[in-house]
């Protein structure tokens, strides 16, 4: 990511900061306390790439902090509250000392370009990234994690080395435009898609070998149909299927060499790569030419027909090379919303900003209270509609809780949740101070975040320990 020169350069940072300055900054905690012994501190510096790399990371981290605090002042007002400042300082410290500031600068760059330059609709944020206040202040997400008690540790845990993973939703039609923008900005040789390998499953291995062996199609189909969909307590593969199905044992000992050899070679080929594809959304953006890090091949872009670079390592291996995968997702729902907003503008003369519409709109709650939610993701099943009519949701938090509760296991608590909302059952807390985190869900523990926060409140767990629960 190209940082504006008027902010600073690596050369200036090398003159301004000594290696001792960097050692202290990257091995102490966010409050300047020594938390690592000397050997662990040296190992951390080495893991981050040594002092030469640290100068770049610090420059990126300082610029990221500037953008985050500028965004925070726009969103929360100036001066910032102590809660917001402490949250940002902690998150920025974790991002810096894990070596990820450049990643966040790139993500905010293409998301803001999509919104402001390309006119592409971007989702409000999904998954654990919505727990980052820095991501919110940068415009990566549109959900205030502090307001909704979303936790950063579910995204990046200081006690668990893990790569950041931000799934970014774009409208279906605009996803390709964003990818082209990224390729043009960062360079065609520095951007690549990720290969996928399709392997031979059990039935497919039988059919492929049978075709080459010129086994009659009817016999090929018969053998494939003998393979069960699952085997109790065992992995589904051909050796286990033969041991489980008597007819396959007979076929394996068949006097017909074509039948015997079909099963023999299918066992040898099962699980081997049959073909390649391109990951639907995974993309790599590299600071150097991608070929300096991984072998690449080319594939045809389905949208444009042009050739594009594809890594020859699949997603599960890419992380071991030090490269970070970014997911560019195309979401049809965003295209529908975008078209609806445009239709409102054309026919009603009203210009809507979908990110700023009220979440307290009475007419919308009336639809939910009536169970009229067909076509609404995760709220359209008959069972959900029934519970919505019983609940009569009146706050956004009610809808969030119903979405979390409507799944096997937690569903058992829905009647209790509804009764507590309407006063038919008392709202009780095992320990009075638990009300702080359970009030919005009427005393019922619904979210993982509540468990994490309660463990810190009641048992003095650290941020990292609460995530490991």
Regions found by a protein language model. Give the residues of each.
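Alpha-helical scaffold/interaction cores of sigma-54-like transcription cofactors
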Residues: 1-469
């Amino acid at each position: 990511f190209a940082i504006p020169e008027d902010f600073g350069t690596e050369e200036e940072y090398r003159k301004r900061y000594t290696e001792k300055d960097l050692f202290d900054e990257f091995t102490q905690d966010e409050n300047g306390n020594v938390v690592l012994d000397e050997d662990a501190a040296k190992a951390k510096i080495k893991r981050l790439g040594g002092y030469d790399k640290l100068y770049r990371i610090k420059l990126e981290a300082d610029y990221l902090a500037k953008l985050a605090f500028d965004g925070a002042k726009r969103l929360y007002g100036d001066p910032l509250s102590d809660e917001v400042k402490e949250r940002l300082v902690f998150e920025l410290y974790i991002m810096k000392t894990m070596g990820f500031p450049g990643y966040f600068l790139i993500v905010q760059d293409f998301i803001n370009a999509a919104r402001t330059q390309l006119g592409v609709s971007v989702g409000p944020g999904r998954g654990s990234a919505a727990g980052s206040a820095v991501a919110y202040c940068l415009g990566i997400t549109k959900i205030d994690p502090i307001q909704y008690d979303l936790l950063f540790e579910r995204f990046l845990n200081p006690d668990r080395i893990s790569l950041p993973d931000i799934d970014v939703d774009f409208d279906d039609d605009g996803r390709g435009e964003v990818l082209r923008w990224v390729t043009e900005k960062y360079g065609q040789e520095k951007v690549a898609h990720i290969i996928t390998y399709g392997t031979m499953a059990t039935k497919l291995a039988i059919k492929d070998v049978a075709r080459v062996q010129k086994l009659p199609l009817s016999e090929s189909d018969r053998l494939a149909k003998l393979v069960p969909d699952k085997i109790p307590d065992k992995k589904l593969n051909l050796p286990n299927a033969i041991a489980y199905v008597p007819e396959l044992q007979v076929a394996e000992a068949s006097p017909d060499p074509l039948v015997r050899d079909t099963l023999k070679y299918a066992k040898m080929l099962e699980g081997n790569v049959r073909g390649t594809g391109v990951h639907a959304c995974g993309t790599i953006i590299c600071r150097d030419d991608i070929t300096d890090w991984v072998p690449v091949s080319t594939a045809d872009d389905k949208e444009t027909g042009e050739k594009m670079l594809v890594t020859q390592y699949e997603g599960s291996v890419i992380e071991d090379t030090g490269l970070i995968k970014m997911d560019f997702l195309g979401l049809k729902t965003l295209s529908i919303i975008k078209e609806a907003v445009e239709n409102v503008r054309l026919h009603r003369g009203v210009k809507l900003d979908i990110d700023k519409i009220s979440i307290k709109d009475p007419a919308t709650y009336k639809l939910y209270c009536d169970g009229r939610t067909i076509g609404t993701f995760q709220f359209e099943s008959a069972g959900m509609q029934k519970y919505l009519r019983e609940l009569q949701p009146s706050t956004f938090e009610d809808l969030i809780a119903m979405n979390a509760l409507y799944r096997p296991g937690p569903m058992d608590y829905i009647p209790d949740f509804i009764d507590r909302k309407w006063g038919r059952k008392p709202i009780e807390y095992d320990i009075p101070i638990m009300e702080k985190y359970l009030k919005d869900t009427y005393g019922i523990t619904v979210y993982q975040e509540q468990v994490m926060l309660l463990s810190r409140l009641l048992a003095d767990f650290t941020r990292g320990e609460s995530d490991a629960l």
